[in-house]
Regions:
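Flexible gly/pro-rich beta->alpha loop and the following alpha-helix that scaffold active-site loops
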Residues: 1-62, 75-76, 80
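Glycine-rich nucleotide phosphate-binding loop and flanking beta-alpha elements
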Residues: 23-25, 68, 123
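Active-site phosphate/pyrophosphate-handling residues
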Residues: 49, 69, 121
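Pocket-forming structural segment of enzyme catalytic cores
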Residues: 57, 75-147, 158-164
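Conserved G/P- and acidic residue-centered "switch" motifs that form tight phosphate/ATP-binding loops
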Residues: 65
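Structured adenosyl-cofactor binding patch, chiefly the S-adenosyl-L-methionine
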Residues: 72
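Active-site-proximal beta-strand elements of phosphoester/diester hydrolases
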Residues: 152-156
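C-terminal active-site "lid" helix and adjoining low-complexity regulatory extension at the edge
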Residues: 166-168
Length: 168
């Protein structure tokens, strides 16, 4: 897939969205697989390839859920492979409050926000240049921004929030 015309064509886009999905291969962040599931090695490779291209050109990138995790691994960070209490319950997203540090994210949404949670993994050690700007009450990183690149990641799914952020 790395040589596919689709990936080469995607690099011409103005921005990159890294969506949610299965877990990244733990070997990509130096760990053995202890709790990762739904692995898609070809997807990992394709997203990391695209991310490298967009970073080289300093184009905007937004990572959502798995996308935040891909960003963190790309910049040399690690992941918590299994995080109890953050995955969906009975097929529905959990809701919880987060606190946001002074940042463009706080400018958009304020100091506290109720977000959804549908993940069982999260950022552990942050990658180079990434700064945590939002946390769950238990300390789980819920959003990051890069210190010098137009790169943001959120652990929650803004596209599934009800209320003013929702398109429905």
């Amino acid at each position: 897939p790395l040589a596919s015309p689709d990936l080469r064509d995607a690099v011409r886009c103005a921005a990159l969205l890294l969506p949610g999905g299965g877990d990244m291969e733990p070997r990509r962040y130096g760990q053995a697989n202890t709790a990762s599931r739904g692995l898609e090695p070809e997807r990992d490779a394709g997203e990391l390839f695209l991310l490298e291209q967009f970073i080289m050109e300093k184009k905007p990138v937004l990572g959502i859920c798995r996308g935040l995790q891909v960003l963190n691994v790309f910049f040399g960070g690690t992941l918590i492979q299994d995080l109890p209490g953050h995955s969906q319950a009975a097929g529905r997203d959990r809701l919880h409050r987060v606190r946001t540090a002074p940042s463009p994210l706080q400018d958009l949404f304020g100091e506290t926000l109720v977000v959804n949670s549908a993940h069982h993994q999260a950022a552990d050690r942050l990658g180079q240049g990434l700064r945590a700007v939002q946390w769950a009450i238990d300390g789980t990183v819920e959003a990051v921004i890069h210190q010098s690149l137009p790169v943001w990641g959120v652990q929650w799914h803004p596209e599934r929030l009800a209320g003013p952020l929702s398109l429905s």
